Amino acid sequence: MNLQRFPRYPLTFGPTPIQPLKRLSAHLGGKVELYAKREDCNSGLAFGGNKTRKLEYLVPDALAQGADTLVSIGGVQSNQTRQVAAVAAHLGMKCVLVQEHWVNYEDPVYDRVGNIQLSRMMGADVRLVADGFDIGIRRSWEEAMESVRQAGGKPYPIPAGCSEHPLGGLGFVGFAEEVRAQEAELGFRFDYVVVCSVTGSTQAGMVVGFAADGRADRVIGIDASAKPEQTREQITRIARHTAELVGLGRDIVERDVVLDTRYGGPEYGLPSDGTLEAIRLCARLEGMLTDPVYEGKSMHGMIDKVRLGEFEPGSKVLYAHLGGAPALSAYNGIFRNG
């Protein structure tokens, strides 16, 4: 497997820290050791997050093409678009962001605080669109790229989650390689890695990266899309493409992709009572903030799996914290009392 042949533009601080979650582990009975790998602390660019790791492999391609405008898409409170806006500002490029109405949540300030506020502060051209949530290529995004061309610019397309981009899975192949190096320092291997999945390239990259040492099916995706079959198809397709890119040396098969579908409801972007409990529990025991859209759902999944005995006693479980806390202010009605 050869990731090094792909150019990478440094946007992160380096390897992200692995933090033991001692109080949460003890609260859940102490039979399973929980750790978090803090992708939410990976960069000085507008709080970073998992998309910043992915963008390190897209930026060289954008620069090689002579692009002057990064064009991306997400929901109103998209973490992806905030990270793209930050990278554009860092590079001195223009940025156009399509923000669709992906979440059926009404709050007077929902489109004025959190991620979208930060994107505007960084100079992005933010375009609100009424279209609802789905996975895949969106017409509104294609129209935004055409508008840049019509104005004489040269757009560089960055799809939702970087996931439909041919290089979108590479960053999290690197995540797996990074974890292996950290395991050598720690003196043990993780038995499971828990990660939130929606558009698929984060888990897909991990599946490929951990397939190199036989742990592909130990990557436990927690679906947050509430459209799990679409998400599963994307993860599998992206993983197969990425495996070919890096020369994994074996095919990705269906059993490599593990996606737990119990925690995505009630729908994309709306938290269940279990998700809200997980968000508050993690915050109050560890001072670690998770959000109602993504990380709260994957945290809910991990906590529930520990409680249900789905991790063997003595297991060491690594929670991939992908970011998302900047969206919390958009849900102030839910968290007004903490």
Curated annotation (Swiss-Prot):
Family stated for the protein in its record: Belongs to the ACC deaminase/D-cysteine desulfhydrase family.
Catalytic activity: 1-aminocyclopropane-1-carboxylate + H2O = 2-oxobutanoate + NH4(+)
GO function term, MF aspect, one: D-cysteine desulfhydrase activity
Cross-referenced InterPro entries: ACCD_DCysDesulf, ACP_carboxylate_deaminase, ACP_carboxylate_deaminase_bac, TrpB-like_PALP, TrpB-like_PALP_sf
Domain of life of the native organism: Bacteria
A single GO BP: amine catabolic process
N6-(pyridoxal phosphate)lysine modified-residue sites: K51
Function comment: Catalyzes a cyclopropane ring-opening reaction, the irreversible conversion of 1-aminocyclopropane-1-carboxylate (ACC) to ammonia and alpha-ketobutyrate. Allows growth on ACC as a nitrogen source.
Protein name: 1-aminocyclopropane-1-carboxylate deaminase
Gene name for this UniProt entry: acdS
Enzyme class (EC, first level): hydrolase
Catalytic activity, EC: 3.5.99.7
